[in-house]
Design a protein with these regions (language model features):
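Long, hydrophobic N-terminal alpha-helical segment
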Residues: 1, 9-46
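Short, helix-capping/interhelical loops that line the mouth of catalytic, cofactor-
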Residues: 1-4, 55-105, 167
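Metal-centered catalytic cores of metalloenzymes
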Residues: 4-5, 11-14, 122-125, 145
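Hydrophobic packing residues in well-ordered alpha-helices of helical domains and bundles
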Residues: 6-9, 39, 102-106, 145-148
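Structural signal for well-ordered, non-membrane alpha-helices
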Residues: 13-21, 50-54, 58, 110-121, ...
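Acidic interhelical loop/turn segments
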Residues: 21-33, 89-93, 97, 111-144
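Short, contiguous alpha-helical
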Residues: 30-77, 126-167
Length: 167
């Protein structure tokens, strides 16, 4: 994994931890509207998403190399005016969470992803490997990593909006 990809993951996760660290239970579980997730649910969704991304990346690493993987415009995920429907496997639980439990889940999923990336052979080029994404189709693995960071940024903005409305 190159330093840019690592930096993206590190930066987005640090921002997420920073915006949720001081939340009390009321703020953590407040739902601005019935169809809007709470901050706890957003964090659970990020955990579930990272697990799915890690599995896709791990499987993609084992595949053969490809020469011409088309780079997709993954930046549309940062547009908060565009709504996406999450697949069931990354839809959060409605069960209440403790902040410490969410932090543990987020640390666990990030550790698992980093372990997959660190364990791969040093001669593997992530831009020559791919995996199928449900929205974007075939994505190079370096774009999967970038998308994970962009997705997290999208939800950080959502969390900040919820926090602002509560203060």
């Amino acid at each position: 994994m190159n330093y840019i990809e690592y930096d993206l993951l590190f930066e987005s996760r640090n921002q997420l931890i920073e915006v949720i660290t001081e939340l009390d239970e009321k703020m953590l579980h407040h739902r601005p509207a019935p169809e809007v997730w709470s901050i706890a649910q957003i964090c659970h969704h990020l955990y579930l998403t990272e697990q799915v991304f890690t599995e896709a990346i791990a499987n993609g690493i084992r595949e053969r190399d490809f020469n011409n993987i088309i780079q997709k415009n993954i930046y549309l995920v940062t547009n908060r005016t565009k709504r996406f429907v999450s697949p069931d496997n990354v839809s959060p639980s409605s069960t209440p969470f403790q902040l410490s439990g969410l932090m543990d889940l987020l640390a666990e999923s990030r550790d698992r992803l980093l372990q997959v990336l660190y364990d791969m052979d040093s001669d593997i080029l992530l831009n020559r490997k791919k995996a199928k994404h449900p929205l974007f189709g075939d994505l190079s693995l370096d774009q999967w990593i970038e998308l994970l960071s962009l997705h997290e940024q999208r939800h950080i903005k959502q969390i900040q909006e919820i926090k602002s409305a509560l203060i």
